[in-house]
């Protein structure tokens, strides 16, 4: 699963999460994303439970604090043995490097493979007008994203979370193997909801995304497994 379809488990508790997962074959090698709500409700035991099912895990907590605090928190995350985790690029180079160091230290302590550290650039719910007016950023949205991506690469991160439209620019300014993981994925028949820079699975593949994160089009589907298979098929159709 080099370029995965990652299911965002945006549920309030383990009971609802497990009810959803029971709709998938037990041998389906899922890659799932755990966000703040579910992790804060269930804690690290949730990660252990999912790993026992041989799921790959993206722990999306978007750390953003002073460098020492981020390093300590990332050490704990590193011990969990997750596959991906996130940090805010806006925290700056010292914070990003501290997070990367903590993640590797925690993995070493637990004798597990270090997670890929992905930096948040601009949220896919943010448009250019909002960014310029509310963040007082004078450059364009693509320029801001590219700047954060370069900063992340220079600060020991493995990649970024970004909209698919930004991938070409990011890879041209970083490296072809710098990971670009794409949220805001919506099949053509789906509503965009609060994702303002959404694309289809095929479009993301054509733009060379290294992985897509899909939530409601799967979790709120009448048949989640069928919806997952359809999205996965579309995603993998572009070679």
Curated annotation (Swiss-Prot):
Keywords: Decarboxylase, Lyase, Pyrimidine biosynthesis. NCBIfam families: PRK00230.1 (NF001273), pyrF (TIGR01740). GO terms for cellular component: cytosol. Homodimer. It comes from Latilactobacillus sakei subsp. sakei (strain 23K) (Lactobacillus sakei subsp. sakei). Catalyzes the decarboxylation of orotidine 5'-monophosphate (OMP) to uridine 5'-monophosphate (UMP). The keyword Transcription does not apply. GO terms for biological process: 'de novo' pyrimidine nucleobase biosynthetic process; 'de novo' UMP biosynthetic process. It is an enzyme of class 4 (lyase). Belongs to the OMP decarboxylase family. Type 1 subfamily. Its EC number is 4.1.1.23. The active site is at 62 (proton donor). Gene3D superfamilies: Aldolase class I (3.20.20.70). The lineage of its organism: Bacteria, Bacillati, Bacillota, Bacilli, Lactobacillales. Pathway: Pyrimidine metabolism; UMP biosynthesis via de novo pathway; UMP from orotate: step 2/2. It catalyses: orotidine 5'-phosphate + H(+) = UMP + CO2. This is Orotidine 5'-phosphate decarboxylase. Substrate binds at residues 10, 33, 60-69, 124, 186, 195, 215-216. One of its GO terms (molecular function) is orotidine-5'-phosphate decarboxylase activity. It holds the Pfam family OMPdecase.
